[in-house]
């Protein structure tokens, strides 16, 4: 599968800095998990905090889910923006 940089429209501008280090399949998995209410428990490492004591960054991610990695892959019907 092509790298994220070659898939126009599938990465939000805020995510461009992560495109080189995160694979497309990882981003699809994360986008689905991050839309769930307890994503901090599922992915404590990704949000930079622990499940019991979330960091300030993870608290921002909760309030502003659009700032996280999200798949905009309409081909398979996925639009994970919360």
Swiss-Prot record:
It comes from the Bacteria. Keywords: Toxin-antitoxin system. Forms a complex with cognate toxin MazF8. Antitoxin component of a type II toxin-antitoxin (TA) system. Its cognate toxin is MazF8. This is Antitoxin MazE8. It comes from Mycobacterium tuberculosis (strain ATCC 25618 / H37Rv). The lineage of its organism: Bacteria, Bacillati, Actinomycetota, Actinomycetes, Mycobacteriales.
């Amino acid at each position: 599968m092509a790298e994220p940089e070659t898939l126009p429209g599938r990465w939000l501008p805020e995510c461009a800095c992560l495109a080189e280090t995160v694979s497309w399949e990882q981003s699809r998995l994360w986008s689905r998990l991050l839309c769930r209410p307890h994503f901090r428990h599922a992915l404590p490492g990704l949000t930079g905090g622990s499940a019991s004591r979330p960091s300030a960054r993870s608290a921002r991610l909760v309030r502003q889910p659009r700032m996280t990695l999200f798949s905009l892959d309409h081909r398979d019907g996925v639009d994970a923006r919360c």
